[in-house]
UniProtKB/Swiss-Prot annotation:
Signal peptide: none annotated. The gene is zapD. Interacts with FtsZ. One of its GO terms (biological process) is FtsZ-dependent cytokinesis. It comes from the Bacteria. GO terms for cellular component: cell division site; cytoplasm. Cell division factor that enhances FtsZ-ring assembly. Directly interacts with FtsZ and promotes bundling of FtsZ protofilaments, with a reduction in FtsZ GTPase activity. It holds the Pfam family ZapD. Belongs to the ZapD family. This is Cell division protein ZapD. Keywords: Cell cycle, Cell division, Cytoplasm, Septation. It is found in: Cytoplasm.
Length: 247
């Protein structure tokens, strides 16, 4: 049984966007294969939200900058005694390859935007009950196609995101691994510290405490207030130990 809960909090806008994209891409595959209306609406709603996120910022530009930054960080470890040089060089090559694929890929999400079925469903998602069979006969008949035909189309849609997914996964993995967890203690449910130009806070809390963190701040400084899940009867201990990584 799980005894700890991991919370992650972005300290800048680019990390906020990346975490949202990661979450939405993960949600795309949760209910596959699509066999009914519920699974279809879950999938198309997440596709629609992904496209909304893509339209708000320069996702490709920010990711390419981060891929370059991670390569420069790894370069500083070349020649350092005790460091696995082959691993460092392999990571650098993987980052270069991910960058090359991303920079040569079509506009992120364009394949999904141009798909007729996705466009039709997106138009109806904001309408309460707007995806009924009489509103979307196209979706209705799509759900009655052979399963293999639907699966193939869904795989094609998801594969169109591969250049983004590959680059984003590498970047987030390296950022998450950039700092170890360290034991910290809050006093009366409050903790604050300097961020040290971090992009991401990762916080491990004991599930027994039934507390959750409210985090505010930016890369230079942040504050954490611990709140009880049970707002009426829950209590916050005077001293609370937790694990924190500033990545």
């Amino acid at each position: 049984m799980q005894t700890q809960v991991l919370f992650e909090h972005p300290l800048n806008e680019k990390m906020r966007t990346w975490l949202r994209i990661e979450f939405l891409i993960q949600q795309l595959t949760v209910n596959l294969p699509i066999v009914d209306h519920a699974g279809a609406l879950h999938f198309f709603r997440n596709v629609s939200e992904l496209l909304d996120v893509f339209e708000r910022g320069e996702v490709r530009t920010e990711l390419l900058k981060e891929l370059d930054r991670q390569q420069r960080k790894l370069q500083t470890w070349i020649g350092v005694p005790g460091v696995d040089q082959s691993r460092i060089e392999a990571l650098i090559q993987q980052l270069k390859a991910a960058g090359s694929v991303l920079i040569s890929a079509p506009r992120i999400g364009q394949f999904l935007r141009e798909d007729r079925l996705i466009a039709l469903v997106r138009q109806r998602l904001s309408i309460p009950g707007g995806c009924c069979s009489f509103d979307l006969p196209t979706l209705h008949i799509w759900l009655h196609l052979p399963q293999a035909q639907r699966d193939c189309q869904v795989e094609t849609w998801i594969a169109s995101l591969n250049p983004l997914t590959q680059a984003l996964t590498m970047v987030l993995d390296l950022i998450r691994q950039s700092a170890p967890f360290r034991k910290q203690t809050s006093l009366n449910g409050f903790y604050q510290d300097n961020g040290g130009d971090a992009d991401l806070l990762r916080l491990n809390l004991s599930l027994d405490s039934q507390l959750y963190p409210q985090i505010s701040g930016h890369k230079s400084r942040f504050a954490i207030r611990f709140m009880p899940l049970d707002t009426e009867n829950g209590q916050v201990p005077e001293r609370l130990d937790f694990e924190l990584a500033c990545c």
